[in-house]
Amino acid sequence: MDTIEDIVLDHDGRGISALRPHVATDFCTQAADLIIDSPGTALIVTGFYILDAGASETDGPPGAVVIGEGLAALGYEVVYVSDRYTVPSINHTIGDAAPVIDFPITSDGQSEEFAVDLLSRYSPSVVIAIERCGMTAQGTFHNMHGKDISAYNARTDFLFTSHNRTIGVGDGGNEIGMGNHADVVAATESLVGMPCVTKTSELVIGSTSNWGGYGLVAALSERSGKNVLASVEHEREILDSFVEAGLVDGMTQDNVPMVDGFSHDENSAIVQRLQDYLRAKGVSA
């Protein structure tokens, strides 16, 4: 039987599997264990701006909501964090289910102050990033093509440098958490040349970050004995809602229900395989 990690790394077109020898074999389970050992409040950070489209992408926010709903079902308080380019779409999708914090796009000093205040206000037990562009060694933020998007990306890294229980989910090397293996990212031709240097306690990789997030929730389900992973139908509804709110496919830059070039059906197939895995393990709702 394929493992959760096998499933979320299937169809790896970007080469993120180059990191697999460097992360835990069961990296989704390791991240799930950190969460289970940290009951309380989870901050979930997401949102990645697509420069040429002038909008945020569909990879990240759907995974954030699937993680958030799963954690809520396990008794966690959930708080979402993004910046002005993604916050409206999260509000559109979740309604009043959880607070959504608009992290300002501002200087390092003001960003760090905002992060410290936010951590003080909510006292999160764990902080999770999924497909969140992270800071390079130069203190800038770059997309997969190497273009500087610093003006469109809040410096949410300070939430992670100021907390000791953190998880990063990424697929390309420029996301928060990739600092754990920045040297491997930089040496892998298919990944970004200017990797994120922000580290996290645990790193989850996937062919898309959403898939990595779904794998994390599958692992949480297995560890808790309760299936809290979104159904195929609900995952499609979440993605459709974000598209309705204006998010774009990061590959085509079109406002369509695709994620990194993967269609609805391709995304659904990954969710179904994870659900089949949980069923085979005897995990039910």
Predicted regions located by residue number:
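Structural motif
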Residues: 41, 125-126
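C-terminal functional extensions of proteins
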Residues: 176-285
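A glycine-rich helix N-cap at a beta->alpha junction
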Residues: 94-118
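Short internal beta-strands
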Residues: 76-85
